[in-house]
Amino acid sequence: NLTNYDHNGRGLGGLMSEILKNVGPDIRFRLSSMEPDGVDDLLLEQIKDPRIFPHFHIPIQTASDRVLQIARRKYSISHVEYIIKKLREIKDDPFIGCDVIAGLPGESEEDAEITYNFLEKNNFSSFHVFPYSPREGTPLFNSKLKIEERVRDERAERLRELSQRQSRDYIFRQNGKMTEIIAEKNGEGTTGNYLKAKIIAPPSFAIKEGELYKGKFTSIFPLEVSIEV
């Protein structure tokens, strides 16, 4: 969780502000897992910088404020919506993923439906779905509000199916869009929005591993990026 960072009262936003002042234009950053309660306006302001890739991951766990309170989470789902809205204003169709836990203690059918509808409405690019299992030291470990395993697993499977559909839709939307891609092994790379793609270049052009290129998505299945040379 990057947003746990704190130094003299300055969180991740303060850290990124200092870093961005002291690095060159060719450096890129990927901010992966950010707990919602640690994402403030200072951090969102830094994310406007083009050196920060348009790929974000927010572990929301559930979209039910009632269940968030049971789990003693320090954020509301309205704040999560605010973050998503701002990220989409700042970046062009960023990849926004999240973590969701199905069958948290106390989760009713209504709560499960609230979470499903929230994920669908906000069109997350993809999400990791975990069936709840008790973990010692957490507020829910001794909870007596356990959900039947069968129900928990059914909810998890339904969420996974939604994630697969939305992930496919996100990939389809990239066709024809410009992107940055970092070259890796075997002529492949990872784009700024964290998609693995084959790099297409003229036969005479030597792709350098670790190099950053600009290009365009020219194929979706398989994913291919034709780079500018």
Predicted ranges, named:
Residues 90, 110-152:
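C-terminal, non-catalytic macromolecule-binding modules
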Residues 63-64, 96, 134-139, 190:
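Short acidic (Asp/Glu) and glycine-rich catalytic loops that position anionic groups and cofactors
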Residues 31, 58, 99, 119, ...:
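Conserved, mostly hydrophobic/aromatic
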Residues 5-25, 71-74, 134-165:
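Radical SAM enzyme [4Fe-4S]-AdoMet core and its adjacent flexible, acidic
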Residues 53, 125, 211:
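Short acidic/polar active-site loop segments enriched in Thr and Asp
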Residues 1-109:
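Conserved SAM/AdoMet-binding glycine-rich loop
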Residues 142-229:
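Terminal RNA-binding accessory module
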